[in-house]
Amino acid sequence: MSDLHNESIFITGGGSGLGLALVERFIEEGAQVATLELSAAKVASLRQRFGEHILAVEGNVTCYADYQRALDQILTRSGKLDCFIGNAGIWDHNASLVNTPAETLETGFHELFNVNVLGYLLSAKACAPALIASEGSMIFTLSNAAWYPGGGGPLYTASKHAATGLIRQLAYELAPKVRVNGVGPCGMASDLRGPQALGQSETSIMQSLTPEKIAAILPLQFFPQPADFTGPYVMLASRRNNRALSGVMINADAGLAIRGIRHVAAGLDL
């Protein structure tokens, strides 16, 4: 039996991409899974696909009341919360400083930081009491942009660096009761969108990148699928497998940190 059997897991942005892969994986692990999802169509799809195995709540990650509403339903259903996974986010499609008009830069900043940083802060505030009671954990999705330049423009990169600082501070404030960690995936096949302020709300990441371009920059030389990144979340959520990690950022970058100067990888001809 999985360590996560009957554990209560709350995931944001569970309707597509990495969020959907996490929903699938934690249900496979036997957990009681809930998600807060902005899209009504995706909420309906989740309910149709997973039935009683999912509690799908329509809501906005920048709204504290929506977290409270979802938590009320989670606690009524499960009586507890063991792990919160802050996953919903938006990307800036590499919008650069020089090529972004000043007024758009300002409105784009507020929209992107509201989702990627304030959303995480509000979720932590809402979930902390239940997680303190269960001595559970929080996990937040980062990005390779939390470590390296070029994984987004200045807005996205700054937001992921801010999220890293938030994780460390929350880990400090909530210890010893709650473990707080992050997972930073590299580019993958997903429906990740951009800010409306930048005119990117209907543009997904795969409209800006191709599988070939993503695979080419990775030393492991493959095009990642969302399911490829679920393992670290399962490990961090497990009390048995993770008693000792808090304030840790797992860099799941398919080898970006070991790219060579002359070649992406030295073993391409092996």
Curated annotation (Swiss-Prot):
Active-site feature positions: 156 (proton acceptor)
Enzyme nomenclature, EC number: 1.3.1.87
PROSITE patterns documented for this protein: ADH_SHORT (PS00061)
Binding-site residues, substrate: 143
Disulphide bridges: none
Keyword Cytoplasm tagged: no
Annotated positions binding NAD(+): 10-34
Upper lineage: Bacteria, Pseudomonadati, Pseudomonadota, Gammaproteobacteria, Enterobacterales
Annotated catalysed reactions: 3-(cis-5,6-dihydroxycyclohexa-1,3-dien-1-yl)propanoate + NAD(+) = 3-(2,3-dihydroxyphenyl)propanoate + NADH + H(+); (2E)-3-(cis-5,6-dihydroxycyclohexa-1,3-dien-1-yl)prop-2-enoate + NAD(+) = (2E)-3-(2,3-dihydroxyphenyl)prop-2-enoate + NADH + H(+)
Pathway as given in its UniProt record: Aromatic compound metabolism; 3-phenylpropanoate degradation
HAMAP family: HcaB (MF_01647)
Name of the protein this chain belongs to: 3-phenylpropionate-dihydrodiol/cinnamic acid-dihydrodiol dehydrogenase
UniProt xrefs under InterPro entries: BphB-like_SDR (IPR047950), Dihydrodiol_DH_HcaB (IPR023643), NAD(P)-bd_dom_sf (IPR036291), Sc_DH/Rdtase_CS (IPR020904), SDR_fam (IPR002347)
UniProtKB keywords: Aromatic hydrocarbons catabolism, NAD, Oxidoreductase
Enzyme class: oxidoreductase
One Pfam family from the record: adh_short
Biological function: Converts 3-phenylpropionate-dihydrodiol (PP-dihydrodiol) and cinnamic acid-dihydrodiol (CI-dihydrodiol) into 3-(2,3-dihydroxylphenyl)propanoic acid (DHPP) and 2,3-dihydroxicinnamic acid (DHCI), respectively.
